[in-house]
Amino acid sequence: MQAFRPLPRTGVVFVTAEAVARGYRAGHPDWCNLGQGQPETGPLPGAPPRIGELTIDPSDHEYAPVGGLWELREAVAALYNHLYRRGLPSQYAAENVAISGGGRAALTRAVAALDQVNLGHFLPDYTAYEELLEIFRRVSPIPILLSREQAYRFTVEDLRREVLGRGLSALLMSNPCNPMGKLISGQDLARWVELGRELDCSLLIDEFYSQYVWNLGPGEPGPQVSAARYVEDVDADPVVIVDGLTKNWRYPGWRITWTVGPRRVIEAVESAGSFLDGGGSKPLQRAAIQLMEPRHVLAEGEAIRQAFSRKRQLMLQRVRELGMVLDREPDGTFYAFVSMRDLPERIADGMAFFRAALDHRVITVPGVFFDVNPGHRRAQRLSRFHQHARLSFGPSLDEVSRGLDRLGEMIRAFAA
C-alpha cells in the first residue's frame, strides 16, 4: 500500500521484537531483560504498599477532560510546590499542569505546540525523540554532539554558544539523561534555567528519572531533582517539565503523565491533545490523585534509591570486570551506557553484541538507537555509538545478576 511509509521501531521495541521471535515473553524465567526501559514494579522494602485494585465510579466511564482531571492537576501542582517551591512567591496551580496518557503523548503534545523554531537536542539521548522530531516539520531539529572524550559534559557556557550560534528557540533533553545517566543539578541546573530565561530559549525537560539520582551536583538539596526548583516565575520562565507515574512511581502500565509549565504553554498543550490523543484514562487519573501525597512520594523515592543503588553498584562492578568501558558512571537513571571497544572483535559492536547476547537469552539495546537522527538528515555514516550498548538495572537484582553472569560466559567464549 503505497499510501503508507515504513516506520522504524524504537530501540526497546526493536530489541523486544527480536527477542520475542526467539521465544522471549515478559516474565519468562529463562530470559534476562537488560534492555528494559521500565523499573521493577513489585514491592520494595520501605516503599508504600502497591495498589492492587481500583474501584471505578460509574461517572468515570466517561471521557476525561483533554487537559486531565482538575483534581489531579491540582494535586500535581501542590506536589511540585511542596517539593521544590516552598517559600517562593510564584507557585504552580492546576492551570500550570496538563495530564496525558503516557510520556510519548506528553512529549508529542509539547512539540506539536511549538512554532517554527530551531530546536536543539543532544546526542546521545532518548530513542523516541528521533521519530518525534521528524513528524512535525515546523520544527527544525538541531543536533548537539556530546563528546565521549569529555565524559559527555556540557556546560552552561557551551549551551549559550549553541543557543546564540545556532539560533535555538527551544531545547529538548532528558535529565537525568537516557541512556548515559548524565545529570544536570544544583547550581548548574539553576544556571541553565537562568540562561533559558535570559535568552528566551524554552527548555523542554523530560524528568522521568528524577527519583533515580546517585550523584548530586553542588548546591542541589535533592533527593530528587527538578528544574521546577530554579524557576522564578512559573508563568513567565520558559521551562516545560514532563514527568509521570512510569518510572518515579513505578507504575508504567498506568500511562499517566503530566506536563508542568507556564499557563500559556499548558493551554497550547491541551489544544494539541485535543487532536492528537483526546486525553488519558479517567479512572486511572482518579486513582493517581492519592499517589501525589508528598509523604508517599518521598517514601517511594527513598525505597527506589536504596534498592536501585545496590543494583547500580553491581552493574558498574561487573561490566568493568567483563572488559566493558564506562565513559561516564551514571549520575542518574537505571542504565549503564557501556562501550564494547575492548571486547573480542566479533562482539565489539553494539548490534553484534546484542545478537550474540540473544543466543544466551539476554536482551540489550545497541547504542546506535540513541544516535538520534530525525528524518535521517545526517549522512548514513557509521554511528559514533556503534560500539556502545545500554544495559538496564531496571529488573530485579536477581535478574540483573543472572544476566551479567550470562554476558560473562558469552564474552569468555568469544575470547577463547
Regions found by a protein language model. Name each.
Residues 60-199, 210-234, 240, 328:
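Conserved core of the PLP fold type I
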Residues 27, 31-33, 242, 325-331:
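Short beta-strand
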Residues 79, 134-135, 229-306, 313-319, ...:
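Conserved core segment of the aminotransferase class I/II
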Residues 289, 305-316, 326-341:
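Conserved glycine-rich beta-strand-loop-beta hairpin in the small C-terminal domain of fold type I
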Residues 5-101, 158, 292-296, 413-416:
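N-terminal small-domain helix-loop-helix segment of the aminotransferase-like
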Residues 26, 166, 198-199, 322, ...:
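Helix C-cap/helix->beta junction micro-motif
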Residues 78, 82, 86, 161, ...:
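PLP-dependent enzyme catalytic core of the Aspartate aminotransferase-like
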